[in-house]
Regions:
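Active-site nucleophile and cofactor-binding loops and adjacent substrate-binding regions
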Residues: 27-37, 54-57, 79-83, 275-279
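Conserved phosphate/ATP/ADP-binding segment of small-molecule kinases
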Residues: 172-260
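Catalytic-core regions built around general acid/base machinery
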Residues: 146-159, 181-188
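Conserved post-catalytic alpha-helical subdomain immediately downstream of the catalytic base
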Residues: 264-333
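Alpha-helix C-terminal capping segments
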Residues: 31, 38-50, 290-293
């Protein structure tokens, strides 16, 4: 099996213990994360060869970050070194009616100062079959939109499948900037992952009769959105995650995969959330796993949705679920009974 390549930032996650608010915290738990890294790590845990490409400084904190990738057998051979710092991501976990909060401190990170010469795409893609990036990556630095475009062109020349998660972050760039950049990248993309907010914010495409704050989700509206995206940008497969928010602790979760002019919905899961950060990344990993293994469209969306459901019951950003765990949930085993 050839490898899946992910390209993006790798940052330090700090969060208070349990459900403490920032103002209550006198210590923080440490983890290392990044959207594309989470996808690679989840896939590696499922047995898929992966390579994560980023840029990290030459210091002890970066070495700790690398050790996390080593632990899960994620390839690091093409990580560039240099720059001053690793970005930081603070997470305050919400509960019930209190939402989670996130604070970023990632300006001037090594990755944000990336230059085209830091990445040899010929070498990176030498034994790859899939390339994954998100809309976070081009938002992080002046040169990164061009670097992403160069990577997409190199992948496309080699017949490598390309997936992208829109992942719009309003504190990184404006809607106008995001739309302008992503519309240049999307023609290269084979599989696009989004949610209803991303589609509206970045592409100005909206789901009819849907209120994400009330948990009201209209299936026909999402099919309309997926079709518009597919038709406008020539994208073969569009996946949309559907989150109905009951509270910060309880969500309904399902997904739509639109491919070949047909819509396929997964079953819906009611999740008591443990940690929703990384839920979209685990969905992306499940989607990629399914597609490289040749699953049909319905099985693909069921697997991706179930994988992501399991992730949101796991602390921190990475889905540490094996394919057998996912298939068990798909088969109806969601009781949570002790396995002996």
């Amino acid at each position: 099996m050839k490898k899946v390549v992910g390209f993006g930032d790798y940052i330090l996650r700090l969060n208070p213990e349990g459900y403490l608010k920032f103002i209550q915290a006198d210590k923080f738990n440490v983890f290392y994360t990044g959207a594309e890294a989470n996808v690679c790590t989840s896939l590696s845990y499922m047995g898929v060869p992966t390579e994560f490409v980023t840029r990290l400084p030459e210091n002890a904190i970066a070495e700790c970050a690398l050790s996390t990738l080593y632990k899960y057998r994620v390839g690091t051979h093409h990580i560039a070194r240099g720059g001053e710092r690793i970005g930081i991501f603070y997470v305050e976990k919400g509960a019930s009616q209190r939402p989670s909060k996130v604070v970023y401190d990632r300006k001037y990170s090594s990755f944000s100062a990336s230059l085209p010469e830091h990445y040899d795409w010929n070498g990176i893609f030498a034994d790859a079959e899939w390339f994954h990036f998100t809309g976070i990556t081009p938002a992080l630095g002046d040169k990164l939109p061009g670097i992403c475009l160069e990577a997409c062109r190199a992948a496309k020349e080699r017949g490598i499948k390309i997936s992208c998660d829109l992942n719009y972050r309003k504190n990184l760039w404006s809607r106008k900037e995001a739309k302008q950049t992503m519309e240049e990248l999307l023609p290269y993309v084979d599989v696009l992952i989004a949610n209803e907010e991303d589609a509206a914010d970045v592409l100005d495409i909206h789901a009819s009769n849907t209120d994400i704050t009330s948990g009201k989700l209209n299936r026909e509206g999402y099919i309309e959105v997926a079709k518009k995206i597919s038709d406008k940008y020539g994208i073969g497969a569009v996946a949309i995650t559907l989150r109905g928010s009951i509270s910060a602790s309880e969500n309904d979760w399902s997904a739509l995969l639109y491919v070949g002019g047909e819509a396929h919905f997964s079953k819906q899961y009611r999740i008591h959330l443990v940690d929703r950060v990384g839920g979209g990344d685990s969905f992306g990993a499940g989607l990629i796993y399914s597609m490289i293994n040749g699953f049909n469209a319905q099985t693909t969306v069921e697997f991706a949705a179930a994988a992501s459901c399991l992730k949101q019951t796991i602390e921190l950003d990475v889905n540490l679920s094996k394919p057998a765990d996912v298939f068990a949930l798909m088969g109806g085993d969601g009781s949570g009974r002790v396995q002996r």
